[in-house]
């Protein structure tokens, strides 16, 4: 009986371990500048993750993202993930995207290298963000550009916001005040 109980406990612990780490701090992604964005370096700050595009009706949200980043950067990191998943609204190279964001919106928050946020080639970090069994909180479907995920200081999921929720809306800012 003790033997069966031990096996059951080990099996449960293994299943829990395989279920995923409920912290985004396990991820490292390629920066648009060619280096690495290490999410473990953001421990102690909230993180807002956004899939972005340069030729989208929501592209002006870059301005609000930068404004929020500048105002709350002592306790918030914003990481943009350019993606070309929706009507090819992010066709440029990493260099072109970086130049556009800096020149047009003065973006200083970290931008990752262009990735896929949906489909068979979804980047691992976006699989984690959109899958409850991975992030421990919610399932989300990325339906368009500028969807946002807010994570707490421990890298745990707080909330998901669709494209229509602007970065400077009270829906997001209430978590930062």
Report each predicted region and the residues it spans.
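Sec-dependent N-terminal signal peptides
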Residues: 4-13
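Conserved helix-turn-beta segment immediately C-terminal to the redox Cys motif
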Residues: 43-47, 55, 59-84, 102-105
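Thiol-based oxidoreductase modules, predominantly thioredoxin-like and allied folds used
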Residues: 75-93, 108-119
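Short, internal strand/loop/helix patches
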Residues: 24, 95-144
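Thiol-/selenol-based redox modules, centered on thioredoxin-like
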Residues: 124-127, 131-177
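N-terminal "domain-start" segment that seeds a small globular fold
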Residues: 18-40, 123-124
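Amphipathic alpha-helical repeat scaffolds
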Residues: 31, 51-55
């Amino acid at each position: 009986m003790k033997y069966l109980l031990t096996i059951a406990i080990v099996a449960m612990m293994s299943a829990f371990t395989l279920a995923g780490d409920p912290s985004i701090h396990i991820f490292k992604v390629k920066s648009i500048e060619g280096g690495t964005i290490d999410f473990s370096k953001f421990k102690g700050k909230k993180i807002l993750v956004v899939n972005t595009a340069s030729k989208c009706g929501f592209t002006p949200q870059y301005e609000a993202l930068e404004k929020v980043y500048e105002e709350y950067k002592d306790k918030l990191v914003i990481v943009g993930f350019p993606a070309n998943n929706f009507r090819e609204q992010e066709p440029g190279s990493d260099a072109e995207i970086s130049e556009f964001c800096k020149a047009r919106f003065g973006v200083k928050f970290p931008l990752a290298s262009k990735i896929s946020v949906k489909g068979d080639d979804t980047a691992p970090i976006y699989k984690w963000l959109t899958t409850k069994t991975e992030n421990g909180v919610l399932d989300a479907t990325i339906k368009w550009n500028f969807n946002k995920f807010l994570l707490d200081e421990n890298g745990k999921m707080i909330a998901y916001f669709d494209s229509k929720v602007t970065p400077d809306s009270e829906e997001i800012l209430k978590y930062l005040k």
